[in-house]
């Protein structure tokens, strides 16, 4: 068993080629083989957003605070309020932003 203590892993600014606006990424856990799942807490300042992107294995996102918005390629912009879970299929092109 491995325990990651709160605050023990360094935060970093979201990279400019992935995000527009102020975004902070706090790692929670990395995948340990054979697992492939990792997790992070990503904080968007109001108006910040991701670039259009995909995830080869899909992605699950839990909205924990403030209202977010998401759009998949060819789809409508959808609201994702706190408590909602957004799941994407592998390679589904999308973006997300916060208000």
Residue ranges and their predicted role:
Residues 1-36:
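A short, N-terminal "cap"/entry segment at the start of jelly-roll beta-barrel domains
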Residues 74-91:
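Short acidic-glycine-tyrosine-enriched beta hairpin
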Residues 97-99:
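Asparagine-centered strand-capping/turn motif at beta-strand->loop junctions
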Residues 41, 60, 76-78:
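Short, surface-exposed secondary-structure edge patches
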Residues 46, 55-74:
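Glycine- and acidic-residue-biased ligand/ion/polar-headgroup-sensing regions
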Residues 24-27, 38-55, 90-91:
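Conserved short histidine dyad/triad with adjacent acidic residue
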């Amino acid at each position: 068993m491995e325990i990651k203590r709160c605050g023990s892993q360094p935060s970093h600014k979201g990279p400019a080629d992935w995000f527009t606006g102020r975004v902070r990424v706090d790692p929670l856990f990395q995948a340990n083989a054979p697992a492939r799942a990792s997790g992070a807490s990503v904080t968007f300042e109001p108006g910040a957003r991701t670039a259009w992107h995909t995830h080869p294995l899909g992605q699950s996102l839990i909205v924990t605070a403030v209202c977010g918005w998401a759009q998949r390629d060819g789809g409508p912009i959808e609201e994702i309020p706190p408590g909602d879970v957004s799941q994407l299929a592998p390679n589904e092109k999308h973006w997300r932003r916060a208000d």
